């Protein structure tokens, strides 16, 4: 799980230009990391590419925190 978190964290830092210390499992994309809805869509697309998977739209809507993304990826691995 740590490896997935590290990869997700790196993508978030690059995409949202946030400090590494802000990216925690509990961090909300919108509330804590100042991402707008377009940022979240782009993050989901980048996660799909990074982890070679497809994230259904209805599943993507449920990914609100870094932890949600990590848990989703781990559940599909």
Curated annotation (Swiss-Prot):
Residues 2-77 form the Carrier domain. GO terms for biological process: lipid A biosynthetic process. The keyword Phosphoprotein applies. Pathway: Lipid metabolism; fatty acid biosynthesis. GO terms for cellular component: cytosol; membrane. PROSITE patterns: CARRIER. 4'-phosphopantetheine is transferred from CoA to a specific serine of apo-ACP by AcpS. This modification is essential for activity because fatty acids are bound in thioester linkage to the sulfhydryl of the prosthetic group. Coiled coil: none annotated. The modification O-(pantetheine 4'-phosphoryl)serine is found at residue 37. It comes from the Bacteria. Keywords: Cytoplasm, Fatty acid biosynthesis, Fatty acid metabolism, Lipid biosynthesis, Lipid metabolism, Phosphopantetheine, Phosphoprotein. It is found in: Cytoplasm. InterPro entries: ACP, ACP-like_sf, PP-bd_ACP. One of its GO terms (molecular function) is acyl binding. Pfam families: PP-binding. SUPFAM superfamilies: ACP-like. Its main location: cytoplasm. Carrier of the growing fatty acid chain in fatty acid biosynthesis. NCBIfam families: acyl_carrier, PRK00982.1-2, PRK00982.1-4, PRK00982.1-5. PANTHER family: ACYL CARRIER PROTEIN, CARRIER DOMAIN-CONTAINING PROTEIN. Belongs to the acyl carrier protein (ACP) family. This is Acyl carrier protein.
